[in-house]
Amino acid sequence: MDKEKIVIQGARAHNLKNIDVEIPRDKLVVMTGLSGSGKSSLAFDTIYAEGQRRYVESLSAYARQFLGQMDKPDVDLIEGLSPAISIDQKTTSRNPRSTVGTVTEIHDYLRLLYARVGHPVCPNHGIEITSQTIEQMVDRVLEYPEKTRIQIMAPIVSGKKGTHKKTIEEIKKEGYVRIRVDGEIYDINDEIEIEKNKKHSIEIIIDRIVIKEGINTRLYDSIEAALRLADGYAVVDIMGDKELLFSEHYACPYCGFSVGELEPRMFSFNSPFGACPTCDGLGTKLEVDVDTVIPDRSLSLNEGAIIPWRPISSQYYPQMLASACKEFGIDMDTPLEKLTKEELDIILNGSKDKEFYFEYKNDFGMTRETWIPFEGILPNIERRYRETNSDFTRDQMAQYMTDLPCPSCKGYRLKEETLSVKVNNHHIGQISEFSINEALDFFDGLELSEKETQIAAPIFKEVRARLGFLKNVGLDYLTMSRAAGTLSGGEAQRIRLATQIGSRLTGVLYILDEPSIGLHQRDNDRLISTLQSMRDIGNTLIVVEHDEDTMMAADYLIDIGPGAGEHGGRIVAAGTPEEVAKNKNSITGDYLSGKKFIPVPAKRRKGNGLELEIIGAKANNLKNVNAKIPLATFSCVTGVSGSGKSSLVNEVLRKALARKLNRNHAKPGEHKEIKGIENLEKIINIDQSPIGRTPRSNPATYTGAFDDIRDLFASTNEAKVRGYKKGRFSFNVKGGRCEACKGDGIIKIEMHFLPDVYVPCEVCHGKRYNGETLDIRYKGKNIAEVLEMTVEEGLEYFTNQPRIARKLQTIVDVGLGYIRLGQPATTLSGGEAQRVKLASELHKRSNGKSFYILDEPTTGLHADDIGRLLKVLQRLVEENGDTVLVIEHNLDVIKQADYLIDLGPEGGDGGGQIIATGTPEKIARSKKSYTGKYLKPILERDKERTEERIATAKKK
């Protein structure tokens, strides 16, 4: 066996055509090719699956049932495999308790740091809470010079009302002769006047001492007596100086605020020992959002100002509201904004104890009379959300609720006692709010004692290393408190990459899926050097990637193709990037060598004269941003990672447009207003989420082509004779489907500690339909055979059916001619799902008032796919007059835009400002723009190439 190579023979997973390939070990290997060509099938479904399977096979049968075991890949032979670790984009944690800090384990080290060198500080008095032994107290007193006069006291009453006669009697019985009351010293036998209704402090004077040699024992005994009498507290009054307050407990001597023994679990918001009891460590509470309940205060109650109580099905709440308003004298025709504060308070929060007469008449004419207090809209929604057993009702009420910072912990997730522990005047919650860059600066500037430095040194080493790795993969703008579920696929992948670098494993096979996603060109170099450093310590890296810089940095490049789907699955070229660039059969090689490229448009559109204007956007890190987007253009929002692109487009603009145009309830990010919405009719967000969550959804059903296909089969003579309607040809309802597998075509068999096995249905043999339905044929094929066709085959087959052909043509136009009409939605990649959505939009008639938003549409796309995607996006603008707004880092997309909005200058707090706007040429001239810096050479290079191509074409 060759130890220098991973040898694969006869790989046939998905569309792979029985391929043989050798991959050098301990190298940075990049796999590329068109979307759907078989890269992931080779990298993840063959190499990783076999590496993982072999590891799991080595475990006991008992252990295997707890681990998700991979299916054995369809391959003849794989040799030279190391233990495999997959770092893809699909395994991001959606758990609200998972944060950047917990995923990278930085939070675990911070917990240890605070448990070992943290100082509890009383939140009420701002003094450090310490626990001291008697020896430490004696040593502290003896630091004062000789002849210093002191008196030792036991504070037995602290800030309590009463005459305290019983307490004074007990002191007398103990044999003490002096006490101090409210700062005045009295003989115990004196008549002491103490006012009953005022707060008082009483200390027993235990001893009076002058500091000199040989008083250690007496001092020790006196302090010990004070501690015994005052439950662990002692006061040493230094005559002519301040008083010293000592405590045996972790408690404030003034107010008694106490902190238990410091231990790491106390600083975990996932542990009951540290989590805030109000929000259970989530940092947020689900509260009713008034602005969602009443989005438009210019409406009156009769005009339906209160969305959740609009009379749709039940008249109960509208009738209750009318009765309450009548009782409390509230005019239901007055706009809500003109009601008095008291009237609005009754509507929103209820009438408390005031009752009103309510007569409810239901749809059947039955009436019910009662006197009840008015509950109020907000408490009503909250109660129905908390108490209902119906998922439907809970989902309905959830639309009007939002996560607000917890009032107890202010969003820090931890108990008050935990947040009282400080290191350099910062509690652990504040450090978690730092960005990676700020955290690095904080730890570099920490001031600790010699002993603390010694304890914290190994912790600092680990924390700094992990922060450094996050910075190196371009994530220095993230905060450690950022919820893992809010990260993009690329960010989550690079976090796991940083965690793996921190482990410093060697001899491992890492398989990565497009780590450059969401990364600005500026940060790409750092990512590449990180990958190279992982290789240099003795690991093999297989990276599925389309980024040109990453491909050129590879030791070995494998191009899979030549096409996608059925047209792919072969090794087209393999070798160094330079060798692949010279290969005439490789599309990737053509793009690397410059033979093929995406041209620069000859002119930029100005739009139709109308524009959308965002005013005062402040969501997340946006700094009161104003932005204009010309309508009927292809516009692009750019900027370094974390600069605020998603905040501006997705949080503010998309949610505001969806709320206005689509009646969506999602609350937009903070902004003043958006002008020009009246020029639009609909907003379409085309993201990379699946087109369906079950295998029953497929490209034919999503684009609507399947409806027309079922109509066609139902219109055949045989179907009419048998009385079959359109529903007969659906695999989702009884009638035409196979009932043995309920139209799935496969049956799942659970194998417990082995992977679940899916076998074709024995009755329909995977065809989904019963025999009678399959008897119906159109042009020689039944419905099951039609679903097995590729889109290209379907287009030819239905060429005489314009309704179907038009829909299938758009799927071919977006470069998905290779997918099958009935291919389950769950097997489509994110990029493929996004293009199916685009295709379904292309065949719709438009009036130029649609607004499309795409967030990084080039994810998973080869340069050739990007060229096709751009043609489709330009078509939406050119032919339909619609507006397309894209968030993108890919320079091929950016250079094709009509208008750019560049955010920055940095990520996180250093971003959130508009750096430059205008055409790509204008941005390229900007000295402040990082995007412009990288765009300029690409524009110049490709303009030159475009001019050369035009000149060559003219000569011919």
From Swiss-Prot:
Subcellular location, record wording: Cytoplasm
**Amino acids binding ATP:** 33-40, 639-646
Q: Where are the transmembrane segments?
A: none
Q: Name one GO cellular component term.
A: excinuclease repair complex
Zinc finger (C4-type) residue numbers: 252-279, 738-764
Cite the entry's keywords alphabetically.
ATP-binding, Cytoplasm, DNA damage, DNA excision, DNA repair, DNA-binding, Excision nuclease, Metal-binding, Nucleotide-binding, Repeat, SOS response, Zinc, Zinc-finger
Known function: The UvrABC repair system catalyzes the recognition and processing of DNA lesions. UvrA is an ATPase and a DNA-binding protein. A damage recognition complex composed of 2 UvrA and 2 UvrB subunits scans DNA for abnormalities. When the presence of a lesion has been verified by UvrB, the UvrA molecules dissociate.
**Quaternary state and interactors:** Forms a heterotetramer with UvrB during the search for lesions.
Q: What is this protein called?
A: UvrABC system protein A
| Annotated source species | Listeria monocytogenes serotype 4b (strain F2365)
